[in-house]
A protein has these predicted regions:
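Donor-nucleotide binding loops and adjacent catalytic segments primarily
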Residues: 1-66, 75
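Nucleotide-activated sugar donor-binding and catalytic core shared by glycosyltransferases
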Residues: 47-163
């Protein structure tokens, strides 16, 4: 399970990490927490959480059972390319939109807006994302579609008509 909030800073990272740790325990999962700007530095070491710094998402995500993230456009796209279910923790701007799209396309059991983060909500979402195979199957289906796209090629074709 990957947990990361990108460039999002938190008023109380220790409280958020405590919720993540307990949610993982309740769901019977272990997590890799990317500290990032949120300051999720891992706190007290245990067998539930490994804290990491910067790691390329395209390398890490395919190895995860599911992802928990802020639903920024880049992280959302990386999750879709990896073919992994997601639990969104949206905060602001476009994040609620991307979190709702992940639910609509069937790769997420639901979002837990960061302002409503609780152990019960996150543990339930983690359990659904990792134990209900529909999310994994749909994520893998979308992965094949996304990887077949040639976005750069399409841009190269369109550029001459724009100049």
């Amino acid at each position: 399970m990957y947990v990361g909030l990108g460039s999002r800073s938190l008023p109380d990272p220790d409280a958020a990490l405590s919720v993540v740790r307990e949610s993982l325990r309740r769901a019977g999962l272990r997590g890799i927490v990317q500290s990032g700007w949120a300051g999720l530095d891992g706190g007290e070491a245990d067998d539930r959480i490994l804290t990491i710094g910067e790691v390329p998402h395209e390398w890490l995500f395919p190895h995860m059972a599911a992802l928990v993230h802020h639903c920024g456009a880049g992280t959302t796209a990386a999750g879709l390319r990896a073919g992994v279910p997601t639990v969104g923790l949206p905060v602001l701007a476009d994040q609620p939109f991307w979190a709702s799209r992940l639910v609509e396309v069937g790769v997420s059991p639901g979002a837990v807006p960061l302002r409503h983060l609780s152990t019960d909500r996150l543990a339930d979402a983690l359990t659904a994302a990792t134990r209900d195979g529909r999310y994994r199957r749909r994520a893998e289906e979308l992965q094949r579609i996304v990887r077949a796209e040639d976005g750069a090629g399409r841009v190269a074709e369109a550029l001459p008509s724009l100049v």
